[in-house]
């Protein structure tokens, strides 16, 4: 029997997590374990907790919340504490409320859950549902349908990537999708904001916020295709080396030392 570990960054009570688990239990004969943060950890990136102890709190059968833990903590500790004989066959992080595209992947706790699994040699996918502010309720129907197909492919044909790589998958907001595209990550134009205020004791504080989600208009990028109504799949590798720049840096260093 296949074993699946599920995590997310929206917290153990999120709708996307519930929908995903329900579909998996219905469609796959697999042993499913859920370890999710006790509270929302959006944009926590690949942080792990080293300054205080963490504890599992049982929510249900093979379902735990990690008290103040991050998605990376959830995967790391699940591997070490819950899997005594062998690690899971697949780790799924999501389904996130909101897209994780372009350089936002580096901020994403959802992607970090998959990333932690990939670092430890386990096949992993990150799932995110794009939505518009006008939507009162998210429709996960297409996301679940595509996720089912992808997982079936993984179990039938093996994982398509090498070690320390994972699949970042985003689903469009439209009810009728145009199809699935394999594509590169786009380039974000960042417009962060910081809103200041004064607390009752006269101390200034700030709320960080992202402004408009602007991206460069690249023909085959995840964000452009997502907005056009395609589900996007981007293979992500954890080797961050800019190989094409190595010779340039070498020449630059040599020139500065002459």
UniProtKB/Swiss-Prot annotation:
It is an enzyme of class 3 (hydrolase). One of its GO terms (molecular function) is nucleotide binding. Its cofactor is a divalent metal cation. Gene3D superfamilies: Survival protein SurE-like phosphatase/nucleotidase. Binds 1 divalent metal cation per subunit. Transmembrane segments: none annotated. A divalent metal cation binds at residues 9-10, 42, 96. InterPro entries: SurE, SurE-like_Pase/nucleotidase, SurE-like_sf. Keywords: Cytoplasm, Hydrolase, Metal-binding, Nucleotide-binding. Its EC number is 3.1.3.5. It catalyses: a ribonucleoside 5'-phosphate + H2O = a ribonucleoside + phosphate. Nucleotidase that shows phosphatase activity on nucleoside 5'-monophosphates. PANTHER family: 5'-NUCLEOTIDASE SURE (PTHR30457), 5'_3'-NUCLEOTIDASE SURE (PTHR30457:SF12). This is 5'-nucleotidase SurE. The lineage of its organism: Bacteria, Pseudomonadati, Campylobacterota, Epsilonproteobacteria, Campylobacterales. The gene is surE.
């Amino acid at each position: 029997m296949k074993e699946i570990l599920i995590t997310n960054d929206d917290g153990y009570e999120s709708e996307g997590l519930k929908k995903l688990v329900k579909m998996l239990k219905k469609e796959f004969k697999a042993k499913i374990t859920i370890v999710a943060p006790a509270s929302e950890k959006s944009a926590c990136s690949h942080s792990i907790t080293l300054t205080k102890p963490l504890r599992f709190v049982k929510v249900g059968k093979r379902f735990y919340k990690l008290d103040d833990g991050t998605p990376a903590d959830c995967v790391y500790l699940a591997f070490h504490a819950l899997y005594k004989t062998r690690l899971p066959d697949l780790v799924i992080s999501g389904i996130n409320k909101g897209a994780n595209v372009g350089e936002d992947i580096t901020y994403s706790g959802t992607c970090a859950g998959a990333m932690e699994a990939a670092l430890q040699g386990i096949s992993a996918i990150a799932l995110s549902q794009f939505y518009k502010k006008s939507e009162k309720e998210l429709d996960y129907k297409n996301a679940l349908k595509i996720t089912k197909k992808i997982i079936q492919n993984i179990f039938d044909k093996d994982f398509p990537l090498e070690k320390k790589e994972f699949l970042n998958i985003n689903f469009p907001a439209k009810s009728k999708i145009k199809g699935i595209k394999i594509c590169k990550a786009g380039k974000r134009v960042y417009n962060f904001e910081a809103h200041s205020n004064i607390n009752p004791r006269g101390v200034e504080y700030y709320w960080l916020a992202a402004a408009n989600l602007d991206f460069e208009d690249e023909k085959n990028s995840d964000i452009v295709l997502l907005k056009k109504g395609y589900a996007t799949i981007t293979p992500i590798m954890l080797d961050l080396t800019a190989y094409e720049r190595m010779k340039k840096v070498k020449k630059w260093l040599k020139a500065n030392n002459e």
